[in-house]
Amino acid sequence: SQGVKNIFYPCMSYNIDEKLGDNNYNCPVVAYYPEVIRSNVGELKKLNFMNDYLGLHRPKDFSKKIYGILCNKFGSISFDEVKNASDKAYDEYHNYMKKIHHKGLEYLKEAIENDKPVIVLCGRPYHLDEEINHGIDKLICECGATVITEDSVSPLVNKFPTGVLDQWTYHSRLYAAAKYVAKLADKDVNIVQLVSFGCG
């Protein structure tokens, strides 16, 4: 009813490798849900539903792969434009992750200096949705604690043995954040893991 003709919803087996785990898989729901939707939503047959397999984890190959997908669906387009857009997207992703890391460390330092409790709030990307997290981050802050995310501290930890097959990107972040928090045992820093839908 809204005139949508194209839906781009790629399957992505792998996440960007953060060098924390034995592998860097996306969970099966994230990776393959487009297949489930394509097979079960008949209306999609009337649209250009693009659920090709794509890998963000290999920047050197990404431009060629997305270029092929776009040309196949939309005809001739400029590889240089696709490559330029891809490079800018990766640059922005890395800049964004640096900002999260720096802001988290800024809040952590300020809280420790002011003897405030800190909660490293671990969750999956969908926990950013207030309909799913129910404002738990705000509630924790209202109780007087500073909240930072697991991806703000996980880069401070090198890969380490976990005793499990550590192949999921978000679990790797969780383990790294927990290890970092454990190093701060003399500080009032704790970790809370959000779990929804039976994930994890």
List each model region and its residues.
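An N-terminal assembly and electron-transfer interface module characteristic of large anaerobic redox
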Residues: 1-200
